[in-house]
UniProtKB/Swiss-Prot annotation:
Keywords on record: Arginine metabolism, NAD, Oxidoreductase
Organism (species): Escherichia coli O6:H1 (strain CFT073 / ATCC 700928 / UPEC)
Pathway: Amino-acid degradation; L-arginine degradation via AST pathway; L-glutamate and succinate from L-arginine: step 4/5
NAD is among the record's keywords: yes
UniProt protein name: N-succinylglutamate 5-semialdehyde dehydrogenase
Amino acid sequence: MTLWINGDWVTGQGALRVKRNPVSGEVLWQGNDADAAQVGQACRAARAAFPRWARLSFGDRQVRVERFAGLLESNKAELTAIIARETGKPRWEAATEVTAMINKIAISIKAYHVRTGEQRSEMPDGAASLRHRPHGVLAVFGPYNFPGHLPNGHIVPALLAGNTIIFKPSELTPWSGEAVMRLWQQAGLPPGVLNLVQGGRATGQALSALEDLDGLLFTGSANTGYQLHRQLSGQPEKILALEMGGNNPLIIDEVADIDAAVHLTIQSAFVTAGQRCTCARRLFLKSGTQGDAFLARMVAVSQRLTPGTWDDEPQPFIGGLISEQAAQQVVTAWQELEAMGGRTLLAPRLLQAGTSLLTPGIIEMTGVTGVPDEEVFGPLLRVWRYDNFDEAIRMANNTRFGLSCGLVSPEREKFDQLLLGARAGIVNWNKPLTGAASTAPFGGIGASGNHRPSAWYAADYCAWPMASLESDSLTLPATLNPGLDFSDEVVR
């Protein structure tokens, strides 16, 4: 039984799904998808649970959420192993994901009060008050690259605000989704407040098509995000939050320490085997001898990155991709770029057939026209050379996406210029593109999102504002508007 609906574990009535370790092929999890009827059942359970959950005090909801944080802490080793084995990422990185989940709780509680708490302003004849109210039943679609942390970034603030939820993990990480759900069960959430439905496209379409849904919170590919946007068009009553990745630029200008710049670039492009939505996909490198030296060093260090299994010792920097198919898609993308005229500096290699262990790739595309503006979700970095900084900014902005952008330079003036010219929701200076803080908003513009950033701003899309003018008494104004007559004279 792998679905959690209305406080009970039930067996899915849809197709059988089997999840294997992407490197070893070991079967980790199997269960049946939720069919459309079970998705509807989960929605009805969430709707029935909503009034009571929403009417609890914030403190009562906070107690349950903080109990979940404690369970994450006490089960950290077990959840780390599940995430690492299912995604293929190394143990160290899965552990940082669980830590981020724990830290998200306190941050979300603080953000609720700062972003969507209550305010009162005194007026001469009363007061103006601001309160926030939950939307109702929300669907949360989770991604596979951070199957614990990223859904957590929607679920926690949504529950704190008083919403009830139907959670669909990625079909590529059902085990992680179930493991997290079992911790929520132990935290003592009332039946129906949080429901789990497993499945792929059919389950997702059934969930997003529900009429009795108040909103949908999504993290994933641009293609799926656009499909959801089209599906919910003409339904302004439903809140829709989309985080859809990017084709992110990193600009390398003058550098004092080449190794430090190479380290930042590797952290930006290849961490999580290139499977972060903020990963650098396009590297813009200043022409000249220093740029040449940087590129040579970047290739030399990158070719030492050998992917390993989740439990290898010593631990590798990167593990496998989510699947062999995902790894092959990166290889295919590199081959297509090479066929267009790209100059391969480091060829990506599948270490072993039948696995997802893929070494990083670097290809220079300077002077090549018609390069697709698409996110290649893996360890493949494309390089362009530029002559002046204005040109670098123009090249960086030459994308329909707008998630993250970064600059390596000792000059604050150039960063200020980039801040004015960049079209991205995250713009970093001498920090990896993959670096982000939950105490700041996380999201992009263009094809990277729909102006509903998460992290610190997640509270904004989890509740709607209610403004009130209030007075504890009613008296006739001393001065009346023209044309109003409240005298005792009888009009004849």
